[in-house]
Amino acid sequence: MGKISSLPTQLFKCCFCDFLKVKMHITSSSHLFYLALCLLSFTSSATAGPETLCGAELVDALQFVCGDRGFYFNKPTGYGSSSRRAPQTGIVDECCFRSCDLRRLEMYCAPLKPAKSARSVRAQRHTDMPKAQKEVHLKNTSRGSSGNKNYRM
């Protein structure tokens, strides 16, 4: 009797295993399809080469590439450049009218500024004036006010 009662259990297990195998086969086939689709899109974009960027797309790309440094629309020129030079080309000429790549965009990024120490930043703030200077400044501004009617002669 043990074999008879286990027969339905074995049939259920066998059918369930076959169902899982089919399900796994379908899932793996769909995964393979999506994987092939992704690879195809990557290879076609890799062979497409540089693109043209204009307007807001160009600005967005420059902001992404340069980050906090900022960027120039024209190539920065050195001091003392001659006035008889060729007309200056900018990022629009290079990336909108023609195609450009990432290296070309990076050429228009502003240079990195050296980090300032906490002391030099504090020295530049106008709120850190000595107390005596603040008081003098306040006294001088209140002299000519017409709201104060206590004039001394």
From Swiss-Prot:
Keywords: Disulfide bond, Growth factor, Secreted, Signal
GO terms, biological process: insulin-like growth factor receptor signaling pathway; negative regulation of apoptotic process; negative regulation of release of cytochrome c from mitochondria; negative regulation of smooth muscle cell apoptotic process; positive regulation of cell population proliferation; positive regulation of D-glucose import; positive regulation of glycogen biosynthetic process; positive regulation of MAPK cascade
Record has Kinase as a keyword: no
Localization terms from the record: Secreted
GO CC terms in record: alphav-beta3 integrin-IGF-1-IGF1R complex; exocytic vesicle; extracellular space; plasma membrane
Pfam name, any one: Insulin
Region of interest: C: 78-89
Record bears the keyword Transport: no
Record-given protein name: Insulin-like growth factor 1
